[in-house]
């Protein structure tokens, strides 16, 4: 096994431990807690894949970080915060909507990259809205936390979520997964609306003037799958 893979896992375990202690002191906001839960699942999956114990890896990671901090204490940091692209978190859903349990009468499940698509094929003739919580960097969706499909009476009938044990997803993965979910829901004569915030950061492309426009194909798809404005 590559030594960098092991040390990377060890450092990730220790940093998650620090973040968990921060959250235990009631200082974490909703996006912070969302990422904490997601990363915990990811670490468990990596632990199983690599055959490494999380507790012992956390201790090893502590030693690595301690050594780095000691080295940094005698020298100026080589990077600056201004060189890091600004990332921010956007929410369509409340914590209650994200954590609410739901079940499917006729389950259908697909996978796009590291994203899992789940939908209830028993739902017919409904007005459905897609909502999502995700992070944005460079004005594009960076990481999807969770997307869910809601009926007008707030019932959950579908979702797209990352698979914790697999590597990260791309903006294109998210778009493809949304199109598959829409296609599955429309098959049963449902009308699907995509929230404005999700459209804005998932389907936008830069034009020559620095603005953002849907491509002709995407615009046709959105017009065909988004219900009328009220």
UniProtKB/Swiss-Prot annotation:
According to the UniProt record, where is the region RNA-binding and homodimerization? 1-73
Q: Which GO terms describe its molecular function?
A: protein serine/threonine kinase inhibitor activity; RNA binding
Q: Where is this motif: Nuclear localization signal?
A: 34-38
What's any GO biological process attached to this entry?
A: symbiont-mediated suppression of host type I interferon-mediated signaling pathway
Post-translationally, this protein is described as follows, namely: Upon interferon induction, ISGylated via host HERC5; this results in the impairment of NS1 interaction with RNA targets due to its inability to form homodimers and to interact with host EIF2AK2/PKR.
Q: Where in the cell is it found?
A: Host nucleus; Host cytoplasm
Q: Which UniProt keywords apply?
A: Eukaryotic host gene expression shutoff by virus, Host cytoplasm, Host gene expression shutoff by virus, Host mRNA suppression by virus, Host nucleus, Host-virus interaction, Inhibition of host innate immune response by virus, Inhibition of host interferon signaling pathway by virus, Inhibition of host PKR by virus, Inhibition of host pre-mRNA processing by virus, Inhibition of host RIG-I by virus, Inhibition of host RLR pathway by virus, Interferon antiviral system evasion, RNA-binding, Ubl conjugation, Viral immunoevasion
Q: Which residue ranges does the record annotate as region CPSF4-binding?
A: 180-215
Q: Which InterPro entries match?
A: NS1, NS1A, NS1A_effect_dom-like_sf, uS15_NS1_RNA-bd_sf
Show the segment(s) annotated as PABPN1-binding. Answer: 223-230
Q: Which GO terms describe its cellular component?
A: host cell cytoplasm; host cell nucleus
Q: Where is this motif: Nuclear export signal?
A: 137-146
Q: What's the family?
A: Belongs to the influenza A viruses NS1 family.
Q: What does this protein do?
A: Inhibits post-transcriptional processing of cellular pre-mRNA, by binding and inhibiting two cellular proteins that are required for the 3'-end processing of cellular pre-mRNAs: the 30 kDa cleavage and polyadenylation specificity factor/CPSF4 and the poly(A)-binding protein 2/PABPN1. In turn, unprocessed 3' end pre-mRNAs accumulate in the host nucleus and are no longer exported to the cytoplasm. Cellular protein synthesis is thereby shut off very early after virus infection.
Let me see what the UniProt entry remarks about domains: The dsRNA-binding region is required for suppression of RNA silencing.
Q: What assembly does the database describe for this protein?
A: Homodimer. Interacts with host TRIM25 (via coiled coil); this interaction specifically inhibits TRIM25 multimerization and TRIM25-mediated RIGI CARD ubiquitination. Interacts with human EIF2AK2/PKR, CPSF4, IVNS1ABP and PABPN1.
The protein here is known as Non-structural protein 1
> What organism is listed for this UniProt entry?
Influenza A virus (strain A/Equine/Prague/1/1956 H7N7)
